[in-house]
Amino acid sequence: MEINNQNQCVPYNCLNNPESEILNVAIFSSEQVAEIHLKITRLILENFLPGGSFAFGLFDLIWGIFNEDQWSAFLRQVEELINQRITEFARGQAIQRLVGFGRSYDEYILALKEWENDPDNPASKERVRTRFRTTDDALLTGVPLMAIPGFELATLSVYAQSANLHLALLRDAVFFGERWGLTQTNINDLYSRLKNSIRDYTNHCVRFYNIGLGNLNVIRPEYYRFQRELTISVLDLVALFPNYDIRTYPIPTKSQLTREIYTDPIISPGAQAGYTLQDVLREPHLMDFLNRLIIYTGEYRGIRHWAGHEVESSRTGMMTNIRFPLYGTAATAEPTRFITPSTFPGLNLFYRTLSAPIFRDEPGANIIIRYRTSLVEGVGFIQPNNGEQLYRVRGTLDSLDQLPLEGESSLTEYSHRLCHVRFAQSLRNAEPLDYARVPMFSWTHRSATPTNTIDPDVITQIPLVKAFNLHSGATVVRGPGFTGGDILRRTNAGNFGDMRVNITAPLSQRYRVRIRYASTANLQFHTSINGRAINQANFPATMNSGENLQSGSFRVAGFTTPFTFSDALSTFTIGAFSFSSNNEVYIDGIEFVPAEVTFATESDQDRAQKAVNALFTSSNQIGLKTDVTNYHIDQVSNLVECLSDEFCLDEKRELSEKVKHAKRLCDERNLLQDPNFRGINREPDRGWRGSTDITIQRGDDVFKENYVTLPGTFDECYPTYLYQKIDESKLKAYTRYELRGYIEDSQDLEIYLIRYNAKHETVNVPGTGSLWPLSAQSPIGKCGEPNRCATHLEWNPDLDCSCRDGEKCAHHSHHFSLDIDVGCTDLNEDLGVWVIFKIKTQDGHARLGNLEFLEEKPLLGEALARVKRAEKKWRDKREKLELETNIVYKEAKKSVDALFVNSQYDRLQADTNIAIIHAADKRVHSIREAYLPELSVIPGVNAAIFEELEGRIFTAYSLYDARNVIKNGDFNNGLSCWNVKGHVDVEEQNNHRSVLVVPEWEAEVSQEVRVCPGRGYILRVTAYKEGYGEGCVTIHEIEDNTDELKFSNCVEEEIYPNNTVTCNDYTATQEEYEGTYTSRNRGYDGAYESNSSVPADYASAYEEKAYTDGRRDNTCESNRGYGDYTPLPAGYVTKELEYFPETDKVWIEIGETEGTFIVDSVELLLMEE
């Protein structure tokens, strides 16, 4: 019998015409709304690759043809289901946004089409980029606004459609972005937004769907209607949202929706007979397919009707039927009817029912009693070819009104198949007044096919609920709403189930398996085919115990080892093991992926695998390549850490172990102590030593480990420095060593390697161009850690190098390397190698890390001869230095000894004054190589004898200060302890020498001094008088006993030591002296190389001027914290007088008559008894 198609929706070809006006009507029926939703779902299922065809499909189906009226009908559909009407203002806002989305999307797809026709045209690229950004901005801000507060449920279907549009748009940008001219960073950001949007949109839709379903707390027809219509309009879309992840699904993907929905109970419109639907909803179960209905006919009050039935079904791949218990009663008013679909493929289902319900409302024995009867007289079951299996009579209640076709042809465009039939009936205690026998039809989506066919050229997703057998301990549970159907669960280790699969490709085709799962524990998944083990791997937990299942709870993770099927019809089994009981493991589905497909994650894995392999000299990972740097290993570690746990957890762990092994090998060959900067100045003779302004920073997006920051300095005499000595015991004779590391940025950073000479390079590295983009904002992880996976790491595992002079190789501008050659080694001499980093400019700075000092290669040929020659020169110069040092040391020691009265060095000679101490100190400082000229805090070959004599000089200063009862007599502390009248100054003359300047005759400087009455004192003053008049230093008591020292410019005076000068030749002498003062007491030397600006020589050429006196041309004179004066300049006079106080207080007064009086020091010394 031919059944006329009663689906009066708009023809499919009209929907494909964006210029069609057919849908431009004021009101949509619920059937039309459902049809459009079903067509969109079909579009996604069948045409799910980015590009114009998919974009135009969305446009033609909905976004290009809907105006305010159509969107209003969409909103009205849900309003009627939940009995809530949106306010006119909110409705107007929502509709205007939807219309705006459509207009913006229209502009975008026009630009997309233009670009597809001319993909190399810069104008087309710019236009599609601009249109994409405009539409993306509109959806990014507009979709959340579709969830109108208080009306989230009423707007849920249009929210889902808007979300679907946004995901499609983002997927286009990720897929085409590189060809559009977007940067990789921009594409990665869009991909992150795509994944986050999938999660957020899914969770919103499922949340409010569940709220709406929960509000219908009584199982009644409205419950099933809500479930059906919101599943079609919202949940079916949501179940397909994950497929928009273009990096996970880069090729066509075949998905299946296994959820089950119900058409309304088969009752006449307006029927009021009471019945219960409480037991109609099926419990979660493995998916089954209807094979036969056995219907029993009863008779009630003269009406023959459907009184009961049995259902025979089968599961996918199952060879036997499942016969369900009897629903209703096995009445015998008529012979039993058997309703069986055709066995012909494609026709073995019912896509439509035409039912004949009957309702009678009859009076009883009195006016109060009425008998209401609701029954079904017959049903026509329609197959896709419109062939009919008839139970008694065909009716007019059409299931297509609720589950319409997806197009015109019932043969190819039906949307659902009849799956099962349950039975609703009146309560026994209500009969016979209310008598109802009502069948309830449940349906599954056409995408869920009776066979699990694995195609060779698509990703085949098979929900595990399509297994034909459950293993003990596995259960089917209701899906969380976003999986497209029910899911399987285990709470203890074991197999889930067996799934029959059909292979259409040659059996040589290889596949890989992925699993969409959620778990509260780390676990192992095992897979087998026909009992043969295929894969086994570890997978991480995805959620915490007690949490509700949400979109983010599920991960798609896979095995990387491909396999083949041995039979065209095979049994696939999956199990979960190695987790403790009472945890929960859920599986949504299994994915079979052609092995030839390359995913972004697999490309990353392959890249990481190559990078790891490139670290080692051989496949057994015994040795590390010499040119693999510490920084390199850290970046490879980042590559491995950024691999997805979902897809390659086992491989990630294996690669991670290999990288850790490489790191240990790197540490073993690194001769530096504490290369990771755990501390500076922690141990006196070990590790790093440095100036106090250096800071250790924790790892960031550039450095995985600690690194150091060196700031600039305001005085080049006091540079910022960091150094370490490589012990002689660690070095091999006649071997080249290399210092290398990574500099994030630097300015005026000087790097030294010192043994026989100084290898030196000044490095300026701008803070851009590193492997991690420094110009971008550093992304932050969820715990505040640097997110090293946020941007794509561009790294060449082949270490493409640009070499200099054929010997030295630097593969990135931020990498530095400096080598030094070692000749013979001597543990007694313990020369070692000094590693120094130094900054001596105000604008200088550096951030560096991953430092290594390692053996590079033995010296041969010319290099060997060169180092032997350099070593001989160094020894010759050292012998010469030793001879010179012996002479200088004897002279300096004689001068130092002369300061003291005995060899215990505990008393000064009576005539020892400050100038004599200064002169002795100068002789001590004539000892060369006390400290390295490159960095004066590092001791040189003569450090021991220098510090011996300098220590005695320090003692002399201390004894001198102790016996001088005048405080601050050298004015080093300014005018502290002095009383001042009038205007005077303390000036630093030529590198920190302080003098008192009395420029005016009315000025006076004085100090009260406590003395011992009856003892003798010597007043000693060193001063210079400039101009006319006299300078006077007076000592007196309160009333009498006054004496004074006078200084005049025009009287010839004896000047210590044995210098004389007159007023006529003073000026010439001053000019000759000007600028010769040196540092007196500033901690350490800054005696730097005079040729520090010369570019680094990367060949192994040695400096010929080793052991030259670096201080001769250097204004920063080393003194290790003690006094360092040159002899007094010509013109200064030292005078003294004896004084015997009679009281315990005296006054020292300094003044002049005219001109300027300059005082270097004032001493009041107690005479020896």
From Swiss-Prot:
Cross-referenced SUPFAM superfamilies: delta-Endotoxin (insectocide), middle domain, delta-Endotoxin (insectocide), N-terminal domain, Galactose-binding domain-like
One example GO MF annotation: toxin activity
CDD domains, alphabetized: delta_endotoxin_C
GO biological process: sporulation resulting in formation of a cellular spore; symbiont-mediated killing of host cell
UniProt KW keywords: Sporulation, Toxin, Virulence
Alphabetical list of Gene3D superfamilies matching this protein: Galactose-binding domain-like, Pesticidal crystal protein, central domain, Pesticidal crystal protein, N-terminal domain
InterPro entries registered for this protein in UniProt: Cry1Ac-like_dom-VII, Cry_V, Galactose-bd-like_sf, Pest_crys, Pest_crys_Cry1Aa_dom-IV, Pest_crys_dom-III, Pest_crys_dom_I, Pest_crys_N_sf
Note from the entry: Toxic segment of the protein is located in the N-terminus.
Protein name per UniProt: Pesticidal crystal protein Cry1Gb
Species of origin: Bacillus thuringiensis subsp. wuhanensis
